[in-house]
Amino acid sequence: MTNIRKSHPLMKIINNSFIDLPAPSNISSWWNFGSLLGVCLMLQILTGLFLAMHYTSDTMTAFNSVTHICRDVSYGWTLRYLHANGASMFFICLYLHVGRGIYYGSYTYSETWNIGIILLFTVMATAFMGYVLPWGQMSFWGATVITNLLSAIPYIGTNLVEWIWGGFSVDKATLTRFFAFHFLFPFIISAMVMVHLLFLHETGSNNPMGIPSNVDMIPFHPYYTIKDILGVLLMIMVLSTLVLFSPDMLGDPDNYIPANPLNTPPHIKPEWYFLFAYAILRSIPNKLGGVLALTLSILILVIIPMLHMSKQRSMIFRPLSQCLFWLLVADLLILTWIGGQPVEHPYIIIGQLASILYFSIIIILMPLINFMENYLLKW
């Protein structure tokens, strides 16, 4: 008799995706972040669902409803901080996942890579809308500043902003629609994740060597299920420590002040995971230029496969490319730091130099180094 997991139509899909899936025998812990992202997404949907049961998307009561969740709902504070810090964990895993894709050349699977970029954009949009919901000072002013950037689009900009706001300023209509979209998007993300996995399983996983691994595959279960569970446990430990000991470490104190359209905070800044893009936006003293640079800072990932000039896929045997990769990582950390600083000397010039370096590394230096390495290897 055939095993039910191999014969049942639904079980067969699960079996071919998570149990009998042939996986390269040498993939390292850098390949754990896909499963960690799945866990983060499930955690966010679950905690978000329970938070939505108590939250009210009205400008008069939104701030108080979040306070009510923290004070009066049983374990409401845990839910709220798990959701807020879960978003931070989500982005840490996302950035590491993308970084691993760049380092090991996984971007050569173009369908998987492009769906991943769309996923990144969708998650960023979801996180931004979620940040507006508590209706604190930084929520309100963050929403005002970021949505206002669309007014830089010629001809239709102003109309577009007012259409998104649902009025002439960020108000009740804006909050209600942001809540609706924030609730809807994670389910769209879940569907896109399935497409992401579908494309990945068409080609099979990449591996640290960047060479075909068809000759040496092992079943996903039990080898990588055990490995993924270890990663999940470590992430839960970090998240629990954050939630239980310093839940507000990554947040902004200004968001504990109710939104006031008449009082602007001294430094308007987004959550920490958007600071690198915010620094790139601020480094250009022109509104439209800044918006274009902001969009391109993420959209540049699309052209990375086209700029791959090396005869080798992975960076594991390319020390010059490795140096450039880690320079890019350091540059992104500098941009993240600059994004949280006030707009004054010397932060302005540091931000501008870091922004130029960011685009230069990806567009100019990476392909040049690839050609150089090919020449050194006489290929």
UniProtKB/Swiss-Prot annotation:
Component of the ubiquinol-cytochrome c reductase complex (complex III or cytochrome b-c1 complex) that is part of the mitochondrial respiratory chain. The b-c1 complex mediates electron transfer from ubiquinol to cytochrome c. Contributes to the generation of a proton gradient across the mitochondrial membrane that is then used for ATP synthesis. It is a multi-pass membrane protein. Keywords: Electron transport, Heme, Iron, Membrane, Metal-binding, Mitochondrion, Mitochondrion inner membrane, Respiratory chain, Transmembrane, Transmembrane helix, Transport, Ubiquinone. The cytochrome bc1 complex contains 11 subunits: 3 respiratory subunits (MT-CYB, CYC1 and UQCRFS1), 2 core proteins (UQCRC1 and UQCRC2) and 6 low-molecular weight proteins (UQCRH/QCR6, UQCRB/QCR7, UQCRQ/QCR8, UQCR10/QCR9, UQCR11/QCR10 and a cleavage product of UQCRFS1). This cytochrome bc1 complex then forms a dimer. It comes from Myotis annectans. Heme b b562 binds at residues 83, 182. GO terms for molecular function: metal ion binding; ubiquinol-cytochrome-c reductase activity. Heme b b566 binds at residues 97, 196. This is Cytochrome b.
